[in-house]
């Protein structure tokens, strides 16, 4: 018999925060007999998943990429958001070699600089201040033709909140005396991550060919027209602003999203040789720059190269001869693999992965259970087989259904999670295994904006639950953060903590 319980399952309930407020709280409204029993029976507490505790600016809500990086690294990982913001403040951004090389080449040839990005203050995939800085950089370096192709948010921000961001950029271009917003579309089209190429195709043709479904004299007018059509920010259809603009050979294109997962598909359409996901009417040869590295396989320079993380949990388990399973449905598969492994695509030795397809629905309020039951089937099977020392699972429901803003669907999502967690803990009891239950950030515990009365579709800064489900006597240390979770797993496995992991165990065995 092994010295420590096996398997140890880390259950990450994506978007499942804790709030004492019952109003518009899908967790409070749901029937959760399993969650209630676990909290009544086992050591539990709350840990932080936002702000500087996860390497983000103070007061910045956490997100799935950041959360999983911290969970897997066992140390606070200073995020690309923070790196870029600091570089702008310090002035280093304006000396960035990758961006300047592309811009200077375009300027020397009398060509345009196109800026792509999610125009919002959400801070999850991008930040509007970074886009302003990019416009300033292009103007400083002599670009006369500067075009912003703005993707609208409404997901990490309220559903109809884009106008102040548009006005901020209009004012920035006016101040610079050059540049303008050339197109608008919702992130639903430009930032897909599930191979829904028909959406990406519309965004690509809008940017490259100036082919929009609608045209407006100004970006604000284009936005208002979309609202009148019943479209919120996320779903704004392809709209050209003023005289339509095309991307030409020799232009520079800088994609200002710092988060990789929703920037990859559109980037591939621009730069991938032999791209075949849809027919490109034109494929201009441009100087394309990614703000960060969206994937090692994408043939384009990154302004901010990835910072290597060593001895992350997956790597350290492999070094110690332990086996691990990573499992999630499509929406969160990258998080439980690439991001949890510190930005590494390949599995470690002894690591196996299971990808369960996410349901093919337009929005997940239409199927709030998503693929959680199928994910759970595979986990229960893995527990019963006792093939793995560690199982790491992400359940997407709280986040993905929370993002829809549909309260009744969010309640159903929480109830689905409760059932699934019950099945896992029951299977673990039969084999003597243990579990840690936590989340990466909040979302589903706040489904309405108290100030505006609109649906609250964004993440929150609320703490997240942490439960140790095991037979060993233990207490929970207060003041924990996501970076403390990996050291906690090592403690429960009886493994020493590597020096690179600066987090501290949350579960103190008695």
UniProtKB/Swiss-Prot annotation:
GO BP: any one term: glucose catabolic process
Cofactor(s) in the UniProt record: Mn(2+)
The protein's name: 2,3-bisphosphoglycerate-independent phosphoglycerate mutase
Record Pfam families: iPGM_N, Metalloenzyme
Catalysed reactions listed for this entry: (2R)-2-phosphoglycerate = (2R)-3-phosphoglycerate
Enzyme superclass (EC): isomerase
SUPFAM superfamilies for the chain: 2,3-Bisphosphoglycerate-independent phosphoglycerate mutase, substrate-binding domain, Alkaline phosphatase-like
MF terms in GO: manganese ion binding; phosphoglycerate mutase activity
InterPro entries per record: Alkaline_phosphatase_core_sf (IPR017850), BPG-indep_PGM_N (IPR011258), Metalloenzyme (IPR006124), PGAM_B_sf (IPR036646), Pgm_bpd_ind (IPR005995)
Keywords, sorted A to Z: Glycolysis, Isomerase, Manganese, Metal-binding
Residues annotated as the enzyme's active site: 64 (phosphoserine intermediate)
Stated family: Belongs to the BPG-independent phosphoglycerate mutase family.
Keyword set includes Manganese: yes
Free-text remark on how the cofactor is bound: Binds 2 manganese ions per subunit.
Subunit and partners: Monomer.
Recorded metabolic or biological pathway in which this protein acts: Carbohydrate degradation; glycolysis; pyruvate from D-glyceraldehyde 3-phosphate: step 3/5
Cellular-component GO terms for this entry: cytosol
Enzyme Commission designation: 5.4.2.12
Binding annotation for Mn(2+) 1: 399, 403, 459
Binding site for Mn(2+) 2: 14, 64, 440-441
Function: Catalyzes the interconversion of 2-phosphoglycerate and 3-phosphoglycerate.
NCBIfam families xrefs: pgm_bpd_ind (TIGR01307)
Residue numbers binding substrate: 125, 155-156, 187, 193, 259-262, 332
């Amino acid at each position: 018999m092994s010295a420590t319980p096996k398997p140890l399952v880390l259950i990450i309930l994506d978007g499942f925060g804790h709030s004492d407020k019952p109003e518009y709280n899908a967790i409070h409204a749901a029937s959760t007999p399993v969650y209630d029993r676990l909290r009544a029976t086992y050591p539990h507490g709350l840990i932080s998943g936002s702000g500087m505790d996860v390497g983000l600016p103070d007061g910045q809500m956490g997100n799935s990429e950041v959360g999983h990086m911290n969970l897997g690294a066992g140390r606070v990982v200073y995020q690309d958001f923070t790196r870029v913001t600091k570089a702008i403040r310090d002035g280093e951004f304006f000396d960035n070699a990758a961006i300047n090389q592309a811009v200077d080449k375009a300027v020397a040839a009398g060509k345009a600089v196109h800026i792509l990005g999610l125009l919002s203050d959400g801070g999850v995939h991008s930040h509007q201040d970074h886009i302003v800085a990019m416009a300033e950089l292009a103007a400083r370096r002599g670009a006369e033709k500067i075009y912003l192709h703005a993707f609208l948010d409404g997901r990490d921000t309220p559903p109809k909140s884009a106008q102040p961001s548009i006005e901020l950029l209009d004012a920035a271009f006016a101040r610079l005396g050059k540049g303008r917003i050339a197109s608008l579309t919702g992130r639903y089209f430009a930032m897909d991550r599930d191979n829904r190429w028909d959406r990406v195709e519309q965004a690509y043709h809008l940017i490259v060919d100036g082919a929009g479904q609608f045209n407006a004299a100004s970006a604000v007018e284009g936005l208002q027209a979309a609202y009148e059509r019943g479209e919120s920010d996320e779903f704004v259809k392809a709209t050209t602003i003023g005289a339509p603009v095309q991307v030409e050979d020799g232009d520079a294109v800088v994609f200002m999203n710092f988060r990789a997962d929703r920037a990859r598909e559109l980037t591939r359409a621009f730069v991938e040789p032999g791209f075949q996901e849809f027919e490109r009417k034109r494929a201009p040869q441009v100087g394309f720059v990614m703000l960060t590295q969206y994937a090692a396989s994408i043939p384009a320079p990154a302004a901010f190269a990835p910072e290597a993380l060593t001895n992350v949990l997956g790597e350290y388990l492999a070094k110690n001869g332990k086996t691990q399973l990573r499992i999630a449905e499509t929406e969160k598969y990258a998080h439980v693999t690439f991001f949890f492994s510190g930005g590494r695509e390949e599995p470690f030795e002894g690591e196996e992965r299971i990808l369960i397809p996410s349901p093919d629905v337009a929005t997940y309020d239409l199927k709030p259970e998503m693929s959680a039951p199928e994910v759970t089937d595979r986990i229960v099977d893995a527990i019963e087989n006792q093939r793995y020392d560690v199982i790491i699972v992400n359940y997407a429901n709280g986040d993905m259904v929370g993002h829809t803003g549909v309260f009744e669907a969010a309640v159903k999502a929480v109830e689905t999670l409760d059932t699934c967690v019950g099945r896992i803990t029951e299977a673990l009891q039969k084999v003597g295994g243990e579990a840690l239950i936590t989340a990466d950030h909040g979302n589903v515990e706040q489904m309405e904006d108290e100030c505006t009365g609109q649906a609250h579709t964004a993440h929150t800064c609320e703490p997240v639950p942490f439960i140790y489900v095991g037979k060993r006597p233990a207490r929970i240390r207060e003041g924990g953060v996501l970076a403390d979770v990996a050291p906690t797993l090592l403690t429960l496995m009886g493994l020493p903590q590597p020096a690179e992991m600066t987090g501290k165990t949350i579960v103190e065995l008695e």
